[in-house]
């Protein structure tokens, strides 16, 4: 008797469970959050890349980012990992409050708590930071091998998008934490 029907898919070939927090993140975004964290960074990335392309400066922009981003993103990775660790290992009145505050956001048709929402958001930021660092390393590796304008343009769009997405996501997370503890009486 088979309990689970055997299926062949990408998950059988390569580990893909790491995509679930990213899927959960995008599934929980409200329209205004999507515009703030996804659409706006895409628009800015495309416009910025177009300006650099017109000025024939895409390669210098990529090199400039490659010079500063690995260190900055590594620090952000450490900071985000620390925030996740603190969130997951802390207990007390404030954490219990976060766990009790339900949001209108749903995963698997169940409302998630603000605690779960923050965990999803921080996990997404961590994954995006790691992906950005890998993309920068890949771009630097390929720089000496392949010189192609449209690849450079795509890389610049992706890097600008991820930088803005990460920073705006962190900003929204900080805002969520702030307002979850903001006392209504202090207004």
Where are these regions (language model features)?
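Long, highly hydrophobic alpha-helical transmembrane signal-anchor segments
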Residues: 31-74, 155
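Hydrophobic alpha-helical membrane-embedded segments
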Residues: 71-92
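Hydrophobic alpha-helical transmembrane segments
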Residues: 9-25, 66-77, 100-114
């Amino acid at each position: 008797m088979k309990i689970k029907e055997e299926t062949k898919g990408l998950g059988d070939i390569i580990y893909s469970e790491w995509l679930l927090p990213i899927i959960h993140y995008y599934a929980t975004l409200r329209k205004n959050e999507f515009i703030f964290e996804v659409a706006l960074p895409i628009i800015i990335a495309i416009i910025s890349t177009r300006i650099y392309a017109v000025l024939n400066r895409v390669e210098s922009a990529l090199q400039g980012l490659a010079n500063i981003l690995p260190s900055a993103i590594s620090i952000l990775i450490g900071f985000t990992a620390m925030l996740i660790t603190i969130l997951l290992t802390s207990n007390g009145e404030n954490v219990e409050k976060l766990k009790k505050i339900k949001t209108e956001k749903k995963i698997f048709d169940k409302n998630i708590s603000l605690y779960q929402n923050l965990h999803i958001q921080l996990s997404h930021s961590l994954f995006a930071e790691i992906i950005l660092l890998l993309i920068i390393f890949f771009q630097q590796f390929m720089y000496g091998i392949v010189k192609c304008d449209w690849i450079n343009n795509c890389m610049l769009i992706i890097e600008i998008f991820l930088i803005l997405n990460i920073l705006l996501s962190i900003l929204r997370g900080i805002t969520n934490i702030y307002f979850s503890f903001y006392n209504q009486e202090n207004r």
